[in-house]
């Protein structure tokens, strides 16, 4: 098992202080994953630490599916996993400051490269601002491609009881990201 995290609070700080050989207690698996269905041509749009779950998907299906990955970071010092995405298919990197790849973000690079019928499916994970931009762009440009997003939410219990990770759905109901997600159809959740 590989744990990837970004220092955000006491929990990730404690993980960062663990040493080789230390024992950690984990509760896995939680929620659902990306269901690629019959899709063969897949756009992967990731930002920041959101690239980690996407890398797992491209690793699992490399050779079986055609991936074009658009991944973005704040700057070159935050860039990671690029070789894994390259092994799985085409990779386009962007950074907010232009220190690596294109200057801009992953959604912008996807939109500049998009052609009708190029993809059967879009999968994405990243900060809420990125997912909102993607949802808006898909709607404004009338891009009909199915899009699945994995939400980054703070999770307490991991089993849906504490309600720390609740998100609003477009039907007016709530969803527990740890149990009902973290992967949702982009039109199913408020971002």
Question: What is the meaning of each model-derived region?
Answer:
Residues 60-67:
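Conserved S-adenosyl-L-methionine
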């Amino acid at each position: 098992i590989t744990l990837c995290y970004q220092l955000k609070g006491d929990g990730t700080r404690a993980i960062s202080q663990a040493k080789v050989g230390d024992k950690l207690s984990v509760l896995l698996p939680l929620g659902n994953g990306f269901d690629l269905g019959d899709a063969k041509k897949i756009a992967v749009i990731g930002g920041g630490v959101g690239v980690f779950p996407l890398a797992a998907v491209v690793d699992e299906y490399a050779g079986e599916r055609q991936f074009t990955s658009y991944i973005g970071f704040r700057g070159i010092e935050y860039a990671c996993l690029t070789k894994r995405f390259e092994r799985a298919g085409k990779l386009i990197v962007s950074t907010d400051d232009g220190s690596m790849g294109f200057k801009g973000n992953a959604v912008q690079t996807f939109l500049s490269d998009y052609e009708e019928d190029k993809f059967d499916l879009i999968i994405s994970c990243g900060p809420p601002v990125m997912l909102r931009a993607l949802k808006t762009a898909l709607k404004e440009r009338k891009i009909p491609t199915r899009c699945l997003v994995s939400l980054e939410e703070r999770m307490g219990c991991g089993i849906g009881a504490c309600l720390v990770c609740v998100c609003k759905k477009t039907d007016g109901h709530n969803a527990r990201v740890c149990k009902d997600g973290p992967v949702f159809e982009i039109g199913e959740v408020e971002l």
